[in-house]
Design a protein with these regions (language model features):
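Gly/Pro-rich cap/lid or specificity-loop segments adjacent to the active site
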Residues: 13-170
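Short, Lys/Arg-enriched N-terminal segments with co-localized hydrophobic residues
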Residues: 1-10
Length: 170
């Protein structure tokens, strides 16, 4: 399923049941460089976890920023741990931050034909400031003007703090 974003970006959605959870996988196209929104786009992957028993309830969202940097979000293999507890009150959104997991990766191929300065410049697009811009784009397009809760672990805690500093009303 494809949807148009508010800003013209495309969102792909795949929804399925796993264990006692309803999983919705999203792929969002966002600018590599937010100063050049018409330029190159990258894909940001996010997975929504919703307990099957709450499928028809309007639960608020909780976005989770993973630690690292450089690690993808956790993959739910069972209805347990912090995800189980959080999913009792929220739709949990697990974000693969830019360059990680199922989002557009950073790999050796990313740097083919680049000199050291070009590589350093390219990597600046994968910092916390752009990770939180991605999250805000996703929030605006997924839940519009509604607010969500934010949780982060390790580097993800830094991203959560950064997000709350830049988007305190989100």
């Amino acid at each position: 399923i494809k949807y148009k974003f508010n800003y013209g970006y495309i969102m792909e959605v795949n929804r399925y049941k796993y264990s006692e959870m309803i999983i919705t996988d999203y792929n969002f196209l966002v600018p590599l460089d937010y100063e050049n929104e018409d330029g190159e786009k990258i894909s940001i992957f996010a997975r929504e976890i919703l307990r099957e028993e709450y499928e028809n309830k309007h639960l608020p969202y909780l976005i989770f920023f993973q630690g690292g940097p450089g690690y993808e979000s956790p993959r739910p293999i069972a209805d347990s741990g912090w995800i189980k507890r959080a999913s009792e009150e929220y739709r949990v959104l697990l974000l693969d931050q830019r360059g990680t997991g199922l989002s557009t990766p950073i790999s050796g191929e990313s740097f083919l034909g680049m000199n050291d300065n070009d590589i350093a410049s390219y990597l600046t697009f994968f910092r916390a400031d752009n990770i939180v811009r991605d999250a805000e784009q996703i929030r605006e397009n997924l839940i519009k003007d509604n607010k969500w809760s934010v949780l982060g672990q390790s580097f993800g805690g830094f991203c959560a703090t950064h997000y709350l500093s830049f988007y305190p009303d989100s």
